[in-house]
């Protein structure tokens, strides 16, 4: 009951992310229209100056498909990936991430080849098709700008340590208007 909470608390941190998650199919982490809708709904119940908008500094590296037989010690899994790690993956693999204009997030795909042995010691190889979605500095800026424009108290990043210096540039730019 946000209205009741809004009357008695000093601050509410709204988790405006994980719309799609590790256990789901690939999709946006914090689609901008979903975030806007959430802000509109909550500011109708709680004074904006009591709200901190949660912004993720991570994404997910989903497994889209696997072909072949993977090594016994390497089961492909969907995993969380920090913004800084996503940026390193892009650089290391020479990938140019796309901008999802609807979600306003970054997305890229890549293929991993895993080689090793199966449980019986026989050599095996599998190919893992992966999709990564994450919020870069531009995406963080757009959500922080939304918080600024709606006169929210501020933002809360999840989680510190996943970010990179460009994330902070995006936040500073949003604060300046």
Where are these regions (language model features)?
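Second-shell loop/turn segments in exported
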Residues: 23-29, 129-133, 157
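Substrate-binding surface in catalytic domains of secreted glycosidases
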Residues: 1-93
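Acidic/aromatic/glycine-rich contiguous surface patches that form carbohydrate-binding/processing clefts
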Residues: 138-177
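Soluble non-cytosolic domains of exported or imported proteins
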Residues: 29-36, 134-141, 162
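Glycan-binding loop/region signatures in secreted carbohydrate-active enzymes
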Residues: 57-146, 175-176
